[in-house]
């Protein structure tokens, strides 16, 4: 989903409940191939990174458009590109739909994609990763490797209640400055956002799950 600039304090939900909440809304999408044909026609060969999900081609996820629900797909696409891998956005989106990782509330895709499915998706497509549901453990790893080129995917609540949805981004640490560089901070972003650390960007009480992608 997209992130807005209005945030409030949120008491963390129990991990088991959060996983259940996402899993019960996952659905297979029978029109994935039809979406793929449309999405492929929108994807330029030189599309590059997605800096904001509302300022890129408006691909279709389930029955919804990219701007409101496409952050997990954008994060996966950006992260794979950060690893130097060839990545087709249309193919990634189709494969998430076919795997049943896209969520449905009232219509297919209106709840985005289950963030806990990202690790399974990456591994099924040849990219190893380490998943973190413990915020402190992830923050420690990111601090330890801040001066290395490391690629991450981060999911977190983006408003004061679960009903405001969550946001998922790709990020990397740079040996040039030791900072965290984030793609798609807001859905209308046009460049990377830079933070000193995980804690500078994502508060502990909003964290859902994170992934450290391992280079081939």
Label for each model-derived stretch:
Residues 2-107:
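Active-site-adjacent structural segments surrounding the nucleophilic cysteine of cysteine proteases
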């Amino acid at each position: 989903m997209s992130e807005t600039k209005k945030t409030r304090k949120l008491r963390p939900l129990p991990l088991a409940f959060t996983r259940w909440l996402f899993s019960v809304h996952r659905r297979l999408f029978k029109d994935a191939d039809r979406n793929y044909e449309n999405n492929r026609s929108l994807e330029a060969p030189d599309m590059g990174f997605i800096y904001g999900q509302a300022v890129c081609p408006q691909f279709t996820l389930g029955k919804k458009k990219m701007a409101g629900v496409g952050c997990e797909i954008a994060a996966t696409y950006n992260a794979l590109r950060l690893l130097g891998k060839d990545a087709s956005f249309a193919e990634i989106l189709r494969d998430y739909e076919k795997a049943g990782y896209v969520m449905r509330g009232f219509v297919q895709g209106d709840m985005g994609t289950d963030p806990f499915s990202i690790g399974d998706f990456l591994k099924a497509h040849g990219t190893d990763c380490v998943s973190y549901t413990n915020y402190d453990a992830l923050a420690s790893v990111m601090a330890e490797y801040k001066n290395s080129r490391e690629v991450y995917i981060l999911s977190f609540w983006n408003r004061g209640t679960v009903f405001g949805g969550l946001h998922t981004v790709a990020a990397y640490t740079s040996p040039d400055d030791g900072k965290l560089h984030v793609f798609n901070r807001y859905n209308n972003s046009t460049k990377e956002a830079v933070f000193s650390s995980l804690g500078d960007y994502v508060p502990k009480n909003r964290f859902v799950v994170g992934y450290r992608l391992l280079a081939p």
